[in-house]
C-alpha cells in the first residue's frame, strides 16, 4: 500500500488544491469506512465494498480500459502460442509495499490458491489445467480447450506469496489487513 488516505484537507480559497503525500507518510495507514468486512483478501471476499477497495491495493495481470480494451498491468507482455497455450511475461521491476519485487511465484501462488477456493474469480481460471514457470519472469498457461479472448479472464488481483508464507490461505492473519 503506497498511500495515506486518512488526511482530509479543506479548501479555504477558490483555488484548486492538490493533496500532496509526503514521502514519510507513504505506506503508513489506510482508514476505510466499511460497514462490515469478511476478509481483506480480494480473492476470498464476498463483500462488494471490500472488492472495490482492494482494487486500489492489489492489481491484476491485465485490466480493462474504459472502452473495454485489454491493458497490461502487472504483465509486461503476453502471447497466445497455440489454441490453448499462453505465455505471459511479468514485470518483475514492480515492487510490493514491503519492498519485494513481483515474481512469477506470486502469479503461480495466486492461481493455484484461486483454484482451491470459492471465489468470484473462480470462473476466470476454470479452463487452466497447467501453470508452468518458464523462467524468472515468464509463465506458461495451458488450458483444457481453446477459450476465445481468454486473456480477458486474467483480470483478477495477484497476491504476494511471501505475504502468505507459513499461514493458512483462508484463515491466516494476512487476510485481516491489506
Residue ranges and their predicted role:
Residues 98-101, 149-154:
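Solvent-exposed, non-transmembrane alpha-helical starts
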Residues 33-81, 112, 176-178:
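N-terminal lobe/hinge region of extracytoplasmic solute-binding protein
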Residues 1-6:
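Sec-dependent N-terminal signal peptides of Gram-positive bacterial secreted proteins and lipoproteins
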Residues 37-39, 68, 94-95, 146-149:
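Solvent-exposed loop/turn segments at secondary-structure junctions
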Residues 77-118, 134, 140:
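Aromatic- and charge-enriched surface segment that lines or borders ligand/interaction sites
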Residues 7-39, 52-55:
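N-terminal, intrinsically disordered, polar/charged segments of Gram-positive cell-envelope systems
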Amino acid at each position: 500500500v503506497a498511500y495515506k488516505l486518512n488526511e482530509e484537507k479543506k479548501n479555504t480559497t477558490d483555488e484548486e488544491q492538490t493533496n500532496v503525500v509526503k514521502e514519510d507518510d507513504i505506506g503508513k495507514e489506510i482508514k476505510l469506512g466499511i460497514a462490515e468486512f469478511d476478509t481483506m483478501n480480494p480473492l476470498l471476499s464476498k463483500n462488494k465494498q471490500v472488492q472495490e477497495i482492494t482494487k486500489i491495493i492489489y492489481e491484476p495481470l491485465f485490466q480493462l480500459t474504459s472502452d473495454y480494451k485489454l491493458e497490461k498491468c502487472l504483465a509486461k507482455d503476453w502471447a497466445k502460442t497455440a489454441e490453448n497455450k499462453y505465455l505471459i511475461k511479468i514485470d518483475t521491476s514492480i515492487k510490493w509495499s514491503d519492498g519485494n519485487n513481483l515474481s512469477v511465484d506470486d502469479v503461480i501462488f495466486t492461481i493455484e490458491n484461486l483454484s482451491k477456493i470459492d471465489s468470484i474469480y473462480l470462473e476466470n481460471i476454470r479452463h487452466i489445467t497447467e501453470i508452468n514457470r518458464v523462467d524468472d519472469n515468464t509463465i506458461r498457461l495451458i488450458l483444457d480447450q481453446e477459450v476465445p479472448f481468454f486473456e480477458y479472464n486474467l483480470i483478477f488481483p495477484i497476491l504476494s506469496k511471501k505475504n502468505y508464507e507459513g499461514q493458512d490461505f483462508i484463515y491466516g492473519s494476512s487476510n485481516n489487513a491489506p
